[in-house]
Design a protein with these regions (language model features):
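Charge-rich, low-complexity N-terminal segments
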Residues: 1-104
Length: 104
């Protein structure tokens, strides 16, 4: 039996400096690469937005997988002040085909 599907959105403050070697884009690219690898393995999908020093992300999937993903994000040194904005049960996913889409 499959656990309940959920959609969870959060916002967090990025901790990396704007003058890092390779620029912000390289740091976000590393986050995306890691997210896509992890998420496809556990069937979590969603979209990530980064702008003005903040992340906004929507995650969808099995409740336990999404909550495990959020726990990893909360412990990631690149995020600070993780605030859950929405946590709802869903019948169907909007981002089923995306392990992690990026929006600027």
């Amino acid at each position: 039996m499959q656990n309940q599907l959920i959609r969870l959105t959060y916002a967090s403050t990025a901790t990396f400096k704007t003058d890092i070697k390779g620029g912000i884009e390289s740091e976000v690219a590393r986050i995306l690469l890691q997210s896509r690898r992890n998420n496809s393995r556990i069937a979590v999908g969603g979209v990530l937005h980064y702008g003005d020093g903040y992340f906004f992300q929507c995650l969808e999937g099995d409740e336990s997988a999404v909550k495990s993903t959020l726990q990893r994000i909360s412990q990631d040194q690149r995020h600070r002040d993780v605030q859950i904005l929405l946590n709802v049960q869903i019948q169907r996913r909007l981002f089923e085909d995306w392990s992690m889409k990026y929006s600027t």
